[in-house]
Each structure stands twice: as C-alpha cells, then as structure tokens.
Amino acid sequence: MTDPLFDVTDRVVLVTGGSRGLGAAMCTALAQRGARVVVASRKLAACEELAARITAAGGQAHPLACHVGDWESLEGVVEAAVAVWGRLDGLVNNAGMSPVAPSLLETTETLFDKIVGVNLKGPTRLTALAATAMARTGGGSIVNVSSVASVRPTPLTTTYSAAKAGLNALTAATAMEYANVGVRVNGIVCGVFDTDATAGFVGDPELLASVVRPVALQRVGRPDEIVGAVLYLLSDASTYTTGSLMTVDGGRG
C-alpha cells in the first residue's frame, strides 16, 4: 500500500524522454502507484510499446510523440497531454542529450543548438506551457532532470554542462515565477545511471572504473534508484519544497 504522503493516485504526469532509460523507470513507477502517465518522446513507437506494457500491468499510460527541441510543437504537446485526462498535475523534463565533442572549437553550431535545444530551450517552453495548464486546475509540480555536469563540468561536455547549468537556473527562477499559482518547480541533479545512453562506457571496465572512482558508493546508479526522488517531488510529501536541487549521484565529494 502506498504511503499517503507519497501518493500520486490519479495525478496526470507528462514525462519527456519517457520511453527509455530513466524516463521509462519513472513512467513505470508512477503508473504502478496510480498516476496517469503520458509517455512522451520523439519515437512514438517506443512510447506506444511502453504504454502498452504499463497498461497490460494494470496501469494507465498514454503515448505521445514529442520533439522537445522543437519550440513551436510544444504547445500542442501540452494540449494533447491535457486532452487525454482533462488536466495536468505534473511534468518531468527528463529528455536530454549529452554528446561528447572533440573540443569546444570543433563543436558545430548545429550540434550546439541541438544540445541547448533539448536540454534547456525545450524545458523552458514546456515549463511555461505546463505551469499555465496546471494553474487552471489548482497547481502542480514540475521536475527538471539535471546532471552533475552542471556543477562539475568537464571539457568534453562543455555545451551540455552549460545547458544543464542553465536548467538549474531555470528551476530557481520559475519556482519563484509560478509559486503564486500553486506550481512548484524543482530539479534532480543526476549522477551516472546504467541506461542505454551510457552503455558505451558502463560496458567498458576501464572507462567504468574512471567514472565510479570519485563516487562514494563506487558504482553507477540503477534506473529504479531515481524513483524515490521523483515520487517525493511530484507528491504532497514536498508541498513546502520549491526551487530546490536534489542530488542523486551516489555521493561525490
């Protein structure tokens, strides 16, 4: 039985990047606890597959195609999410991309725009649209999925680190902007998790060793280990929490 404090029963939550990795873990866990989940990502087929699995297990899920980097299409995304169950109670800005560039000089404008578009521009627009929709039904909660790269940047991920640092600033600013309409905005600063996006180095013993060396727990995270933070921030357990960044990284000094 779900603790009433962390109850998300019947809450409508839109999760971007929801069809795989951390997003899929979030969608599955939220649905298991009674939330009505909108699984959104660029590949509709992948969203449909996860939504079908959630539904078969007794949960409620709806697939939705969503290109977070496409500013003009995002209004339609929020409208579509609201249309499914008549409201929107939660948004998880989880979609992201973190390609490694050889150097800042060799980072093309196209790559720069893609990284900033998915990691900052899209969440900015979605936050504004979702907060407006939430305000119409009494408020809600927005969770921005950031990265340790935003506070511990490395040379090979300069643009990604800068975009995620911008996302942290967006979290603080919008928490202030939307507090008066009952919308809370918080962030999760994630360490490295074992997902398809990190398979390239998690599967390489030498690279993996270098990644976990500064981590207190000496390992990468499992996708299900993000669930507790998300449940806290989307539920009434966090009604006095806004503008905060919660670090989930296995402990880094």
Identify the role of each PLM range.
Residues 102-104, 108-116, 207, 211:
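Substrate-binding pocket helix/loop in short-chain dehydrogenase/reductase
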Residues 132, 176-180, 239:
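Alpha-helical segment proximal to the catalytic Tyr-Lys
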Residues 127, 163, 171:
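Active-site helix of classical SDR
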Residues 44, 65-77, 109:
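The beta1-alpha1 cofactor-binding region of Rossmann-like NAD(H)/NADP(H)-dependent oxidoreductases
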Residues 219-248:
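C-terminal substrate-recognition "lid" of short-chain dehydrogenase/reductases
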Residues 147:
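Residue(s) in the substrate-gating loop at a strand-loop-helix junction
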Residues 19-20:
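Conserved glycine-rich cofactor-binding loop
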